[in-house]
């Protein structure tokens, strides 16, 4: 008897998920493998991917358009949270996994499957994200993980697929593993596994090099309402169009490349190359607007919780209780994050040159000015300083007595 009768497999068209199809049927006795591929704006022609799954032995090959919920329900919360894992990575890949897992469970329910499957290996982050999300959403569903259990090297995996007529997808000329969606691209493997090897220009597709970026700078304005980006240069755009336009503008000027050593959930360090031009641009502008519209104690507390929010998403805990509680805090802070931020884009950098909020700014010129319009009561400072410094004076006096 097989491990499951009917399985819905999260499918990307890559080598691991393609080999999963014959492996599930031949080695684990699964009768019916249905694949699900998510359209997250990666730009691939999905019909060839759908057909590839059928050619590999899938009984059905489904494709779901998830672009709009991906941006509205996953990318926008990350922008509101200024989510940067380890202070740098804006979670472009990690944000996609809970959405795919959610839809995978829904498809499994629709077709009456008794299990779901994915092609994640045993040393990556995605296995954690999928397994934990599925367990939270559908604890009764089995999760089959052939790529984690089959013990084959990449070369052996490709050879196994060739036995069932699957073409080898990676050549010696292009040894990189690439994951992409509308938010960005992640590139790893091959020569990049040596952290001293500079990434060649051929691995980038969304951004120009600094050398190829225009010599002239460009100023843009990004508008926000309740913490969400809503327009660029005075033009209101829907969420998907906003991301596309931000990707275009930032990419032209060489903004959005990351080369970092990151700490994976499973405890190892990995070298990752990312392109996330639009997402990084929005987070930078959003942070700047918050500095204008949030009270000091709220801003400081939020900056601390942002790191925890990013950690939870990276670690696959999107559907967990702490992430849910932090969402409530993040959303509550965003009611006043309304306004416009102006940035100058030039040769790989985005520099804030202005920010304004008609109804939510906590910057009061009459209080901040040193000119004749100054309304700050300077005389009140003496009493404030006396009380503020009292604990320090008392502690210093005690130190002098003890010595």
Swiss-Prot record:
Gene3D superfamilies from the UniProt entry: Argininosuccinate synthetase, chain A, domain 2, HUPs, Single helix bin
InterPro entries assigned to the protein according to its UniProt record, in alphabetical order: Arginosuc_syn_C (IPR048268), Arginosuc_syn_N (IPR048267), Arginosuc_synth (IPR001518), Arginosuc_synth_CS (IPR018223), Arginosuc_synth_type_1_subfam (IPR023434), AS_cat/multimer_dom_body (IPR024074), Rossmann-like_a/b/a_fold (IPR014729)
GO BP annotations listed: argininosuccinate metabolic process; L-arginine biosynthetic process; urea cycle
Alphabetical list of Pfam families matching this protein: Arginosuc_syn_C (PF20979), Arginosuc_synth (PF00764)
EC number of the protein: 6.3.4.5
Binding residues annotated for ATP, in chain numbering: 10-18, 38, 119
Keyword hit for Amino-acid biosynthesis: yes
Residues that bind L-aspartate: 121, 125-126
Keyword vocabulary terms for this entry: Amino-acid biosynthesis, Arginine biosynthesis, ATP-binding, Cytoplasm, Ligase, Nucleotide-binding
HAMAP family linked to this entry: Arg_succ_synth_type1
Subunit (UniProt): Homotetramer.
PANTHER family listed in its UniProt record: ARGININOSUCCINATE SYNTHASE
Protein name, per record: Argininosuccinate synthase
């Amino acid at each position: 008897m097989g491990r499951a009768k009917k399985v819905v497999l999260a499918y990307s068209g890559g080598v691991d998920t393609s080999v999963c199809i014959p492996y599930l049927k031949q080695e684990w006795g699964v009768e019916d493998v249905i694949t699900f591929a998510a359209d997250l704006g990666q730009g691939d022609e999905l019909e060839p991917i759908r057909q590839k799954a059928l050619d590999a032995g899938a009984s059905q090959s489904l494709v779901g358009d998830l672009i709009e919920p991906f941006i509205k329900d996953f990318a926008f919360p990350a922008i509101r949270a200024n989510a940067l894992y380890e202070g740098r990575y804006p979670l472009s890949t990690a944000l996609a996994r809970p959405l795919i897992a959610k839809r995978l469970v829904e498809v499994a329910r629709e077709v009456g499957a008794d299990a779901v499957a994915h092609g994640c290996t045993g040393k990556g982050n995605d296995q954690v994200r999928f397994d934990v999300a599925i367990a939270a959403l559908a604890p009764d569903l089995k999760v089959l993980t052939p790529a984690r259990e089959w013990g084959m090297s990449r070369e052996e995996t490709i050879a196994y697929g060739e036995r069932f007529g699957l073409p080898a997808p990676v050549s010696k000329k292009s040894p990189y593993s690439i994951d992409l969606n509308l938010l960005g691209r992640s590139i790893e493997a091959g020569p990049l596994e040596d952290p001293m090897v500079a990434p060649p220009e051929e691995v980038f597709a969304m951004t120009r090099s600094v050398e190829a970026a225009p010599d002239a700078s460009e100023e843009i304005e990004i508008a926000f309402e309740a913490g969400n980006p809503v327009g660029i240069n005075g033009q209101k755009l829907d969420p998907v169009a906003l991301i596309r336009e931000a990707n275009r503008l930032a990419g032209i000027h060489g903004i959005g490349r990351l080369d970092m050593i990151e700490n994976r959930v499973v405890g190892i360090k990995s070298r990752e190359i990312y392109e996330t031009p639009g997402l990084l641009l929005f987070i930078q502008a959003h942070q700047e607007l918050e500095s204008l519209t949030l009270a000091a104690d709220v801003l400081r507390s939020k900056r601390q919780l942002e790191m925890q929010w990013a950690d939870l998403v990276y670690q696959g805990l999107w559907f967990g209780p702490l992430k849910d509680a932090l969402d409530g805090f993040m959303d509550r802070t965003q009611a006043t994050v309304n306004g416009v931020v102006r940035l100058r884009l030039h040769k790989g950098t985005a520099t804030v040159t202005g920010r304004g909020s008609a109804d939510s700014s906590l910057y009061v010129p009459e209080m901040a000015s040193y000119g004749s319009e100054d309304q700050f009561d300077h005389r009140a400072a003496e009493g404030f300083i006396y009380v503020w410094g009292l604990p320090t004076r008392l502690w210093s006096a005690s130190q002098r007595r003890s010595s």
